[in-house]
Structures are given as structure tokens and as C-alpha cells.
């Protein structure tokens, strides 16, 4: 569905830019909602089992996990194309959410909940690296000044929706199953990820054909 020219003008979006803006906004929206659901499940279960003073250890664990995630991300950046890197990052986030959901049936130690809550920070890092890496490559400097605020705004309603869904859904599905809901949200974002590259590939082919 194409928005009205008045709406595009209000957001300072040129008509030809709307398809990509829409896909990036949707990507950020569903990933943000998935991470919000994951965080709700992780923090709720952690505080149910441990005093708030234990959060200090979570931050220490987070520091090590973020360091490792940064190294791995840097290695992948040099080995994979932008498209493959983005898909791999999305799959890592989705798979990790599924792992923690399954892990609650398998692992009984307290350490598991420390790792799960610390992993939220890793998810947030990967999401930002993926999204802004895509945006920086797909837009030039002039476009970025106009559009970065628009495409990144998907994160705000995503968090609102994610936390609202968590509040309403917990009495019916339980806190643990929010992890599974987050997994599906992250997996659905993959659709917009692949769709945006399909759009860019078609655009590149048409430009190449015109130039030839």
C-alpha cells in the first residue's frame, strides 16, 4: 500500500524511497518487539528467584558476553556480504531465544537465569549492529539525515507493543512462553530482511540494464 504524497512530504520521504523505508521500519519493529518480550521474560524470572542486588553479577557477565559478541561480529563482517551478515545476525538472535526457551526445560541451575538476562544486552547489541549497518550501507549521507529518524522510530511502538502484549499474555501463556513469542517475532522480521534485499537486487539489475 502506497501512502499519500502529503504523508510522504510530512515525513520528508521521497516517493521512490518509501518501499525501503517501510521494510527497514518493519524490520526494526518486529525485532524490537521480540527483544522486548525476551527482556520481560528474563527480568521477571530473574527477580522472582534472586534479590535485586544480584543484578550486579548480571552486568559483569554482560560485559564478557558483549566483548565476545563484538569479536564474533567483527569476524563475520569481513567474511560475509551485507545480505548474508544481516540474515545470520537475525537467525542468531532468533535461535538464541528458542535456546533459552528450551533451556528452561533442561537446565535447573541458577546460573542459567544469570546468562539469560545478560544475553538481553547481547541481543540489543546485535540488533543495533545489524540495523544501523544496513542503514549505513543502503542510504547515502543526504538520505541518512532525512530518513534515519523515520526508520529507527519503529523501535518505539515495538517496545510499547511488546511490553503491552507481555502484560496481557502472561496470565494465559505464562512468563516462560514469552521467550517463544519473542522467537516468532524475531523470525518474522526475517521476512522483511529478505524482502528488502530482493527489492535492492531488482533495483540494481534495472540500473545495470539501463546503463548497459
Regions found by a protein language model. Name each.
Residues 1-25, 52-53, 80-84, 91, ...:
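Intracellular loop-helix junctions on the cytosolic face of multi-pass helical membrane proteins
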Residues 20-73, 112-170, 208-212:
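Substrate-agnostic recognition of the 12-TM MFS/MFS-like secondary transporter fold
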Residues 75, 94-97, 134:
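Generic beta-strand or strand-like secondary-structure segments
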Residues 98, 131, 200:
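Short, basic/polar, glycine-containing "phosphate-handling" surface segments that engage DNA
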Residues 71-83:
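A short N-terminal interaction module
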Residues 31, 65-67, 92-103:
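A generic, lipid-embedded transmembrane alpha helix
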Amino acid at each position: 500500500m502506497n501512502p499519500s504524497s502529503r504523508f510522504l512530504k510530512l515525513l520528508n520521504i521521497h516517493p521512490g524511497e518509501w518501499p525501503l523505508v517501510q521494510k527497514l521500519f518493519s524490520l526494526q519493529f518486529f525485532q524490537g518487539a521480540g527483544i522486548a518480550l525476551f527482556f520481560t521474560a528474563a527480568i521477571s524470572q530473574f527477580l522472582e528467584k534472586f534479590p535485586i542486588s544480584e543484578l550486579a553479577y548480571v552486568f559483569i557477565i554482560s560485559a564478557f558476553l558483549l566483548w565476545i559478541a563484538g569479536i564474533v561480529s567483527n569476524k563475520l563482517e569481513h567474511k560475509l556480504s551485507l545480505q548474508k551478515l544481516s540474515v545470520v545476525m537475525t537467525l542468531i538472535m532468533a535461535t538464541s531465544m528458542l535456546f533459552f526457551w528450551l533451556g528452561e526445560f533442561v537446565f535447573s541451575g541458577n546460573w542459567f537465569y544469570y546468562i539469560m538476562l545478560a544475553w538481553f544486552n547481547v541481543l540489543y547489541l546485535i540488533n543495533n549492529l545489524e540495523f544501523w549497518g544496513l542503514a549505513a550501507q543502503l542510504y547515502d549521507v543526504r538520505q541518512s539525515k532525512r530518513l534515519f529518524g523515520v526508520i529507527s522510530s519503529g523501535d518505539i511502538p515495538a517496545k510499547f507493543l511488546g511490553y503491552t502484549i507481555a502484560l496481557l499474555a502472561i496470565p494465559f501463556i505464562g512468563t516462560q512462553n514469552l521467550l517463544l513469542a519473542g522467537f516468532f517475532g524475531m523470525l518474522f522480521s526475517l521476512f522483511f530482511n529478505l524482502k528488502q534485499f530482493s527489492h535492492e537486487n531488482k533495483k540494481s539489475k534495472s540500473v545495470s540494464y539501463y546503463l548497459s
